[in-house]
Amino acid sequence: MNKNLSYFLDKCTYFVGCEPKEVKIRNMKNWGNCRKDKRITLNLKLAKKPPICTEYVLIHELCHLIEFNHGPRFKALMDNFCPNWREIKKLLNEEEN
């Protein structure tokens, strides 16, 4: 995942137009986390998911750098930067067989 993370991070930060202070990867309960100090953490288990899921989580967390909550403005940002985010979210949360 580290190999692909650099690619996805460059792509997504360019697309969204903001950059985190730091990105870490570790085991965690959520797929991603964004702190107010602009540090993003991604779940190591994303490596087992399709690459589009990593891109979605990165865009989701980068949007939190603009809008910290999940209100209408956040959803509008997601709709703009990742129009199919709802479908990707379903794919991400499917149980592995």
Predicted segments, located by residue:
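Active-site-proximal or metal-binding-adjacent scaffold patches in catalytic folds
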Residues: 1-56, 65-97
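Walker B catalytic acidic pair
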Residues: 61
